[in-house]
Amino acid sequence: FFSVAMQVAAHEAKLGHGKLAEELRDMIDAAKRQGSTTGTASNLVPINKPRGELSGLLTVTYPKSRLCDMILEDAVSEKLKRTIKEQHLHSKLQEHGLSPRRKLLLVGPPGTGKTMTASVLAGELGIPLFLVRLDSLITKFMGETAAKLRQVFDAVGNVRGIYFFDEFDAIGSQRGLANDVGEIRRVLNSFLQMIEQDQSNSVIIAATNHPEILDYALFRRFDDVIEYGLPDQTQIAAMLKGRLAGFKSTRSAWK
């Protein structure tokens, strides 16, 4: 664009329109200076960045992680590969009346890779990762939490992405427990209805360290329940090898 504009300015100068040519050059120089200060990637606003009230409910990231970055049990790895493959083929599956798995419940001890799994799926599928902020979702006012949850599910239908509910037992605990709270029960009822009615192309992931206290109705709403276990000695060694691959060492003993 700038080169074409400079050619126009030179042409006008040849025709004797010196003032016009000078004004064009000044405009080009000003545009170049403005572009150098505002055209950096750090100032670009992601097109899927939540706005308005959603900005307090969802945190968006664009992970680059891949499945090969994780050390997993074979059963877990196969389930994730199947999910990724089905998501890549979701249009073809829908043509045949089938639906890909897109509602996943991840259970297991802390530090076993549940949160990283959400990042890996987002990276493999090339879609944004939306973390649902439970601290903003849950409020003390009756009915407000369910209304905010509705906003989250509206976003699920409008923008394709990975929507991740971490520490899901905060809103998914069994109804009827001794410490049951009426407002959380209503939130759970709303969640059960919304996730069952959801027909979007987004992937919904919930993760918890305490599957034993989840409400039984939740397990029927998810397409797949993936159980993570603590790594064995072989997996720990493989993880350390991957992390230390860029370092030179002749004294590492992996056994």
Regions found by a protein language model. Give the residues of each.
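Alpha-helix N-cap and coil->helix boundary residues
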Residues: K19, E23, Y163, R251-A253
